[in-house]
Amino acid sequence: MPPPFAHRITKYDPADRDERGHYHGAEVTVSDHGPVEAAYLEAIAAFAQESGIDRLEIREPAVTGFVTFGLEAPVDGHGLAGLFPADLAGYYDGAEVSVPVALELVRAMLRDQGAWCRLEQQDRFTVHVGWDQYVYVGSDQPCAAAVARTRELGLFAEPITMSPYAADLEEPEVTQAADEEFWERVRAELAVPQMLLLEESYLYNATRWHRLTEHNLDTVRAVLGPRALLSVWPDLNPDVDAVLAALPEDETVDFVWEAPNGTISHVTVDETHHQQLATSVAGARAACSLSLALDERHPLFHAALPDSDGVLRARW
C-alpha cells in the first residue's frame, strides 16, 4: 500500500490551473541546475526528516535506453558518476542508500541525465520524479512543517490522493521466480546436449549476455545481479553471415554476438546500421538477432531472481 499522505511538489502555482487541474501558466519543464533545483532537493529533505527517514530503497532502477524521451541530452554515466562505480555496482533494485545519495539521484532525474528510479521505504515514504519537473512525495505522516517549508522555498506542495507513479498502480509482468525449479529446467535444456543464451537484465535498459553450458551454469549463476530479470533463448547461430543476411529491413533489433575472445556483446540496430554492423562483428564466432517488438520477442522461458530468503520482490 502507498503511504496515506501524498503531495505533488512543483514550481507551478496552483492558481494557474483550471477546474480540471490543467496548468496554463508559464512552464519551464527542465531543471535550472541552480536555485530552483536546490529548492526541490531541500523540500524533499524536509519531508524525509519530518517522516523520520534516513535511508531509502532504490526500486526499478533504469538507465538511458536506445530511445530517450528526456528534454535534456543524456550524459555519460547516466548522471550516476560519483555516486556509483562505472559498472553501476550498488545501483540495483532493492539497494538502500542514504538520504543525501537519494537526493543526488533526484537531481539526476530532474536533469533528465538518464537514470530513473523510484525511491521508497516500504509503505512509510516514497519519492517519485515525473515529467516536467513534477515530484511526488508520499509519507505516513502529514508533514505539515515540510509543506510550510516547501512554500518558504518558493515551491508548491499540493495534497493529492496518490502518486501517479505508485507501484500499486502497475501489475508486474513477471511473476515467476528464478528458483531451483527454474534452474532445473535450464539444466534439463542444456543436457540435450546444447548451449543456451541467457539475457540478464540487471537494470531497465541494461543487459548482460551469457552463453550457457552444463559446465559453466553454476559459475554464471554466481555473478548474476540482484533481482535481475532472466530470459533464456536458443543458442547463438555459428553462421554469422546468415544472421546478418536475414536482418529485417524495416525493424529495429537487438544483435548479439560472441567475439573471437569469447566476449558476448550486443547492440540495438536498424537498417541504417547494417553495413557498419557487419564490419563491427567481423570474425565473430556466432550471433543472433532478437526483435524488439514485444509480440515477437518470445524467450524459451524467463523469470526474476528472488532475494536470498526465496521471496520474489523484483518488479518487472
Describe each PLM feature range.
Residues 1-134, 138-316:
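Structured alpha/beta or helical-core interaction and ligand-binding surfaces enriched in interleaved
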